[in-house]
């Protein structure tokens, strides 16, 4: 088997429209629609799907949990711009900036939470 990438993640949220709007506004991610009205956002070549806990779409995770995700975005902007942007959108930084190691090497990261308390790392590679 040759796995080469991640296609999407699915976040279980309280309110799909609120989440779509927040990710679009805060991270400037394009909104997408698929499969008869499901909504998500595009992140590079990947996407984030949103579902509610009692979603009718199958299959789903065995224990879909609101606020149970922890994932990282990669940013290309200078760290000062990232911090300023988050402040402009009243997004609280819960940790960082911190030195971290991402899949491609050393990075500096800050951590925020979305409206459902999912933990989002925003990393800027040092190279």
Regions found by a protein language model. Give the residues of each.
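Residue-level marker for the onset of beta-strands and adjacent loop->beta junctions
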Residues: 7, 28, 36-37, 69, ...
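Vicinal oxygen chelate
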Residues: 13-16, 71-119
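Core segments of cupin and vicinal oxygen chelate
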Residues: 11-54
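Helix-adjacent hinge/juxtasegments
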Residues: 60-69
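Pocket-edge structural micro-motifs
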Residues: 52, 95, 124
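Conserved catalytic-core motifs of GNAT/GCN5-like acyltransferases
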Residues: 30-36, 98-100, 125-127
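N-terminal beta-strand motif that seeds the catalytic metal site of vicinal oxygen chelate
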Residues: 1-18, 69-71, 125-127
């Amino acid at each position: 088997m040759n796995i080469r990438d991640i296609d999407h993640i699915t976040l279980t949220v309280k309110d799909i429209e609120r989440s779509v709007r927040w990710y679009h506004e805060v991270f400037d991610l394009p909104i997408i629609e698929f499969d008869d009205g499901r909504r998500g956002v595009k992140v590079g070549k990947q996407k984030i799907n949103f579902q509610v806990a009692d979603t009718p779409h199958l299959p789903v995770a065995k224990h879909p949990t609101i606020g149970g995700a922890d994932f990282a975005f990669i940013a290309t902007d200078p760290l000062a711009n990232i911090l300023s942007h988050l402040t402009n959108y009243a997004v609280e930084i819960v940790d960082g900036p911190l030195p971290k190691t991402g899949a491609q090497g050393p990075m500096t990261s800050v951590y925020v939470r979305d409206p459902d308390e999912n933990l989002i790392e925003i990393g800027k590679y040092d190279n």
